């Protein structure tokens, strides 16, 4: 009555006279789709001009069941392929009056799908639980449903839509100008996305989107991943990926789904494809609406002045002397999950140590390998490789020209070593072009990067969140050097497990036809087979009880499980310390050096293998393989009280 809807209060005594009752079959769904639904009724049209479909949904639950509503929605909108045999509506023309909870604690919610120019429709909800909410909250609810009053001119469908949809408009009115405020908001959204993923997983079928995505990551990346770990990893990646895109955006006055995807550099095609799928911009759309409410993150970032945020980073990190991206990630993890920040401290390596290692590698390349430009060298060499014969009749040996210096960080983490490597290469490059104008240096640098930098720089990382951080960090440092990201040249930093053998190049795309992880896996396999890599740097993980026990890496480890001389099995009852992850990474790096017959390994490691008798076979192997071994003792095993 207050909203001027053409319904008499007496009509509610005979509810069947003003509504149509629906079951699962009526809208082309299976019975299990209604598992959380007590009833679904459509309010009969109140005038001939009404385009809106108004439905009443009673949930058998104490909370709003967004996944159950998704299933209803899928039966009420037009099918992409086969026409439905019942009435259908555009998503924006549907209004759901939802009820859930117990008799003493009932909640009424009104849901609408906001129409967007780009991306997935986003669910908008206003709700009220009169038994538990105070007068102010109830008054706010009443004010907002006031927008749902019946329009005077029912023939003006656009005005009708504008009025009703205005009931659901919410916005961040204040521009975010400092990193502390932004990290709190983004961390809260990441937590919400993580929880929504778990909620969806709990109610959807095995062929649902989240189930398929989770299975794909387990099959091809981390085989013992739990759904909690998956939800956590995915949520962080989405939030940090969008933040990365916003930081690369050249405009401060606008930001939307299309811009977010466009601003993800071509150097990271995996994240670009993942965001296209997540935000509904891929050619193969698999989501009906923004069920994870990722658009909330886009909205926050729309009202974020990233120029001020980045200036705030630099102020807090001594004018950029420290890594501002790591600084933000640490703040983000503190707000998101303090325990996880402690657990993930392994990703952070002190910048002075990183600087020293990268400079040392650059110096050795110049003095011992005779490469005047060090890490920036453009020199090439001829290598042998096996290729398929032209008519497919077996394999044959061939040769090709490859760069003399190719770098790999097999435990990339957040990309600290690769960032410093780029900076060192840039310093060497500028020194070589000393005396030229800034315009000329920038021009030649933009020619150098896709031809001589990106193809030589490689990184492997197992966890998706630091992987996204690494790509953001490296894109930003390239941007700072003046690189304009022309072309489709990617950064060879891949989401993969270094300690697993390279698979076949004809990787079967298991999730969707345009599966981002499938493309990433194919390219990671090709990078793993690169027999030209000869500089391996980084800070591999330390884990006495390593989970990396695949046959391929364990077979390689047999090299270190022999007595000096390499013929007799190591006479140790329990050589378990040889199975530490960092030892496996040293052995992994050794394979590249053996393939090239020359190279450098520069790792930060524990010092056990230098003295402990269990490692005598490993020490002998390294001493016979390498001409020079430099050990810098940092007293990392000392305890500071």
Task: State where each predicted segment sits.
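Short, basic/polar, glycine-containing "phosphate-handling" surface segments that engage DNA
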Residues: 1-229, 233, 299-330, 564-573
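SAM-dependent methyltransferase catalytic region
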Residues: 316, 320, 334-631
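Non-catalytic, well-ordered alpha-helical scaffold segments
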Residues: 94, 184, 191, 211, ...
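Short, hydrophobic/amphipathic alpha-helical patches that form generic packing surfaces
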Residues: 236-250, 330-331, 472-479
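Short, solvent-exposed secondary-structure capping/transition elements
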Residues: 67, 105-107, 229-230, 247-260, ...
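Long recognition/docking surfaces used for binding and targeting
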Residues: 248-337
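Class I S-adenosyl-L-methionine
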Residues: 629-641
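Generic structural signal for hydrophobic core residues of well-folded globular domains
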Residues: 221, 242, 246-251, 278, ...
């Amino acid at each position: 009555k207050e909203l001027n809807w053409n319904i008499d209060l007496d009509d509610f005594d005979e509810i069947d006279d003003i509504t149509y009752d629906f079951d699962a079959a009526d809208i082309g769904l299976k019975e299990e789709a209604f598992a959380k639904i007590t009833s679904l009724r459509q309010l009969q049209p109140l005038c001939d001009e009404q385009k809106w479909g108004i439905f009443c949904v009673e949930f058998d639950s104490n909370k709003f069941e967004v996944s159950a509503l998704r299933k209803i929605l899928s039966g009420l909108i037009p099918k992409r392929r086969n026409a439905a045999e019942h009435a259908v509506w555009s998503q924006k023309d549907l209004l759901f009056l939802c009820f859930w909870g117990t008799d003493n604690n009932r909640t009424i919610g009104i849901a609408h799908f906001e129409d967007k120019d780009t991306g997935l429709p986003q669910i908008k909800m206003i709700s009220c639980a009169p038994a538990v909410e105070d007068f102010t909250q109830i008054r706010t609810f009443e004010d907002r449903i006031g927008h749902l009053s019946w329009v005077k001119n029912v023939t003006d469908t656009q005005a009708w839509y504008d009025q009703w949809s205005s009931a659901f408009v919410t916005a961040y009115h204040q521009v975010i100008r400092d990193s502390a405020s932004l990290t709190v908001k983004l961390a809260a959204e990441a937590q919400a996305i993580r929880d929504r993923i778990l909620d969806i997983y709990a109610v959807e079928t095995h062929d649902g989107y989240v189930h398929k995505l989770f299975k794909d990551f387990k099959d091809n990346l981390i085989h013992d991943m739990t759904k909690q770990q998956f939800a956590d990893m995915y949520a962080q990646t989405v939030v940090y990926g969008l933040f990365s895109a916003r930081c690369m955006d050249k405009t401060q006055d606008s930001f939307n789904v299309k811009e977010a995807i466009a601003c993800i550099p071509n150097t990271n095609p995996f994240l670009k494809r993942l965001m296209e799928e997540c935000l509904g911009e891929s050619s193969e759309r698999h989501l009906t609406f923004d069920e994870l409410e990722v658009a909330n993150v886009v909205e926050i970032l729309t009202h974020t002045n990233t120029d001020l945020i980045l200036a705030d980073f630099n102020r807090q990190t001594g004018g950029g002397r420290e890594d501002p991206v790591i600084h933000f990630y640490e703040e983000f993890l503190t707000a998101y999950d303090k325990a996880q920040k402690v657990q993930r401290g392994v990703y952070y390596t002190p910048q002075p140590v990183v600087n020293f290692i990268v400079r040392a590698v650059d110096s050795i390349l110049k003095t011992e390998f005779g490469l005047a430009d060090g890490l920036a060298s453009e020199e090439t060499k001829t290598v042998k490789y096996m290729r398929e014969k032209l008519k497919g009749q077996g394999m044959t040996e061939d040769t090709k020209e490859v760069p003399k210096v190719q770098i790999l960080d097999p435990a990339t983490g957040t990309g600290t070593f690769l960032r410093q490597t780029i900076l060192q290469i840039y310093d060497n490059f500028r020194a070589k072009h000393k005396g030229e104008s800034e315009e000329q240096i920038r021009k030649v640098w933009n020619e150098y990067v896709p031809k001589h930098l990106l193809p030589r720089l490689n990184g492997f990382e197992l966890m998706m969140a630091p992987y996204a951080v690494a790509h953001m960090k490296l894109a930003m440092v390239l941007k700072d050097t003046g690189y304009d990201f022309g072309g489709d040249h990617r950064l060879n930093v891949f989401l993969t497990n270094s300690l697993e053998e390279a698979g076949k190049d004809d990787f079967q795309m298991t999730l969707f036809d345009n599966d981002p992880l499938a493309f990433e896996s194919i390219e990671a396999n090709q990078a793993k087979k690169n027999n030209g890599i000869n500089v391996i740097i980084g800070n591999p993980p330390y884990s006495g009880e390593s989970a990396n026990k695949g046959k391929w890496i364990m077979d390689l480890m047999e090299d270190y499980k022999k007595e000096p001389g390499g013929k007799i099995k190591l006479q140790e009852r329990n050589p378990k310390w040889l199975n530490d992850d960092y030892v496996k990474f040293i052995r992994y790096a050794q394979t590249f050096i053996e393939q090239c017959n020359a190279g450098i390994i520069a790792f930060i490691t524990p010092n056990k293998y230098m003295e402990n008798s269990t490692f005598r076979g490993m020490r002998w192997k390294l001493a016979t393989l390498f001409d020079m071994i430099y050990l810098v003792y940092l007293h990392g095993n000392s305890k500071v009280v």
